[in-house]
């Protein structure tokens, strides 16, 4: 709903400006993380899947973005090209993080002749400071400075459908249904409830990795021996 409404809003802005058929691009935004962490995400022993761009973190966002676009096209008939971008980079400048930064992407798209931008905060569920500052302030200001029509789609927050979805996830995990019976919105299939042993490696020595059954404090090693009930974990839905 939000993405379709955002597309309609940008189209209305362009129509008011006398350019109703000008090209529009959708940017799905999520929090950037260090490239090394992204490449290690999901790389647990025995994981059968090959992740797009070599990262479970990136693959999940790309799959979710594709699912959103498919739903928008089916329900509203609206369509536009889209891409995944990143925000909120921090840390040492010499450490590579996932790119492109949303502001760089907006500038590149403007140079390609794009006239409208729809920003979808795909990686966020509420309007906290990083959404309000990085998107509503910086990204939309970049759009204004380049003369682009733009809007930022709201996060789900306490939207009824989002809350109902959370209830469904809880119900799945408290039911006796087989994991394989859980529905999934993307080709990645049902996801794990907690990180599998060896997943999401901790590259920062001496700092704990807290991820369910994944590791002991400060070592980055498995908290449960392979094959144990604790190591097995469950699977969830993404």
Enumerate the predicted regions with their spans.
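Extended amphipathic ligand-handling, pore-lining, and cofactor/metal-binding catalytic surfaces
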Residues: 1-238
């Amino acid at each position: 709903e939000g993405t379709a409404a955002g597309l309609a809003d940008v189209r209305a802005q362009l129509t008011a400006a006398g350019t109703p058929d000008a090209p529009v691009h959708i940017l799905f935004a999520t929090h950037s993380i260090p490239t090394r962490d992204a490449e290690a995400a999901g790389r647990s022993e025995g994981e059968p899947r090959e992740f797009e761009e070599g990262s479970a973190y990136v693959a999940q966002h790309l799959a979710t973005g594709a699912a959103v676009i498919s739903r928008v096209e089916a329900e509203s008939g609206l369509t536009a090209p889209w891409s995944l971008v990143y925000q909120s980079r921090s840390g040492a400048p010499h450490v590579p993080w996932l790119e492109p930064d949303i502001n760089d992407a907006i500038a590149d798209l403007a140079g390609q002749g794009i006239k409208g931008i729809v920003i979808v905060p795909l990686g966020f569920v509420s309007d906290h400071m990083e959404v309000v500052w990085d998107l509503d302030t910086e990204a939309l200001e970049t759009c204004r400075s380049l003369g682009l029509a733009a809007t930022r789609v709201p996060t789900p927050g306490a939207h009824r459908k989002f809350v109902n979805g959370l209830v469904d996830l809880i119900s799945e995990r408290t039911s006796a249904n087989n994991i394989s019976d859980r529905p999934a919105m993307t080709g990645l299939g049902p996801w794990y409830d907690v990180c599998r042993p060896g997943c999401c490696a901790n590259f920062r020595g001496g700092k704990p990795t807290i991820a369910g059954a994944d590791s002991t404090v400060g070592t980055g090693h498995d908290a449960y021996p392979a094959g144990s009930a604790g190591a097995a974990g469950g699977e969830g839905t993404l």
